[in-house]
Amino acid sequence: MSASDNNNSLEQKFAPLKNDRLLRALRFEPIDTTPVWMMRQAGRYLPEYKATRAEAGDFMSLCKDTARATEVTLQPLRRYDLDAAILFSDILTIPDAMGLGLYFEAGEGPKFKHPIRQQADLDRLPVLDVNDSLDYVMRAVTSIRTALNGQVPLFGFSGSPWTLATYMIEGGSSKDYRYTKGFLYSNPDFLHQLLDKLATSVIDYLDAQVVAGAQILQIFDSWGGALGHRQFIDFSHAYNKRIVAELKVRHPEIPVVLFTKGGGLWLDIQADSEADALGLDWTMPIDRARQVLTESQRQLTKHHKKLQSSKAIQGNLDPATLYGSPATIRAEVNAMLDSAYANGEKTGYVANLGHGITQWVNPDNAKVFIDAVHDYKI
């Protein structure tokens, strides 16, 4: 059975998709209005999310509870006219499954009890059977896809190898990546060994999410922007490119979005991948990004690189905009969409925030954002 036939057989398990606006935009097909969703759209800014999380007891218990993970995924779709759902989970599920002891401290974010600091730590990392150690994620994907009943497409996701490695080596979040960058410059082979293991796990993890029901995939390279130019190419992009290429072999019809926070400087580099779309944070104007990608595609084609004709863009409203008044939010959305369509394009764009929505946003302001996107005349 071909990969395409396999994907078709998977789709037969679920209700037909009713709103395919986002998928059409990613394929550069005509759309009636701009599709929109929000990173972290199921999260702490919603009172109903807080109530469900309190019932679960803690964050990871919520992630591992199929019914509650399904519930919080659906909550924003009951409030807002969103064009996609995204699996409720965490980017650190892979290192947690590798035995690093993930835990959360109030006000400090995720931490690991057993960070990777020496070769023995690295050698102990298991080769994951994602359908065993991360089966709760796959159960959630299937449950969510079934509950959506074809309303909108479902995103699956993973952290990038570089981003996962920073947490695993630092033992949590970091401002300076002291240990990770220390290995990068003093023992790069050690870091490459870790990134190689992680890339293999990310491929299998995202593959399993598609089999479970995910219709789109996003790779979150949240800390790729912390790297220098050459280091980004070698320690982040190379592994992201490998992941996307393998996913396209296994599931050629599944769109892949690659989001590198702080990666606007490297759009020309990221263009040399099989990703269908590139995510932008708020520091890069969308019209400029379109121009860079158009030129990059021209140069890559000139050098006989086998690529699709173009790449869609996703993003990129500053999440802090949602602290503003409704009038300010609408004005900023209109400016963002003016930029997105400035070069005459009428598709190939998905509206989103430039990073995740924060816990302090008024839920009513999120609705202003979403409605303003849909109200904009392309």
Curated annotation (Swiss-Prot):
<dbReference type="GO" id="GO:0005829">
    <property type="term" value="C:cytosol"/>
</dbReference>
<feature type="binding site">
    <location>
        <begin position="40"/>
        <end position="44"/>
    </location>
    <ligand>
        <name>substrate</name>
    </ligand>
</feature>
<feature type="site" description="Transition state stabilizer">
    <location>
        <position position="90"/>
    </location>
</feature>
<dbReference type="Pfam" id="PF01208">
    <property type="entry name" value="URO-D"/>
</dbReference>
<keyword id="KW-0456">Lyase</keyword>
<dbReference type="GO" id="GO:0004853">
    <property type="term" value="F:uroporphyrinogen decarboxylase activity"/>
</dbReference>
<keyword id="KW-0210">Decarboxylase</keyword>
<comment type="function">
    <text>Catalyzes the decarboxylation of four acetate groups of uroporphyrinogen-III to yield coproporphyrinogen-III.</text>
</comment>
<protein>
    <recommendedName>
        <fullName>Uroporphyrinogen decarboxylase</fullName>
        <ecNumber>4.1.1.37</ecNumber>
    </recommendedName>
</protein>
<keyword id="KW-0627">Porphyrin biosynthesis</keyword>
<dbReference type="InterPro" id="IPR000257">
    <property type="entry name" value="Uroporphyrinogen_deCOase"/>
</dbReference>
<feature type="binding site">
    <location>
        <position position="355"/>
    </location>
    <ligand>
        <name>substrate</name>
    </ligand>
</feature>
<keyword id="KW-0963">Cytoplasm</keyword>
<feature type="binding site">
    <location>
        <position position="90"/>
    </location>
    <ligand>
        <name>substrate</name>
    </ligand>
</feature>
<feature type="binding site">
    <location>
        <position position="167"/>
    </location>
    <ligand>
        <name>substrate</name>
    </ligand>
</feature>
<dbReference type="InterPro" id="IPR006361">
    <property type="entry name" value="Uroporphyrinogen_deCO2ase_HemE"/>
</dbReference>
<feature type="binding site">
    <location>
        <position position="222"/>
    </location>
    <ligand>
        <name>substrate</name>
    </ligand>
</feature>
<dbReference type="GO" id="GO:0019353">
    <property type="term" value="P:protoporphyrinogen IX biosynthetic process from glutamate"/>
</dbReference>
<dbReference type="InterPro" id="IPR038071">
    <property type="entry name" value="UROD/MetE-like_sf"/>
</dbReference>
<comment type="subunit">
    <text>Homodimer.</text>
</comment>
<comment type="pathway">
    <text>Porphyrin-containing compound metabolism; protoporphyrin-IX biosynthesis; coproporphyrinogen-III from 5-aminolevulinate: step 4/4.</text>
</comment>
<comment type="similarity">
    <text>Belongs to the uroporphyrinogen decarboxylase family.</text>
</comment>
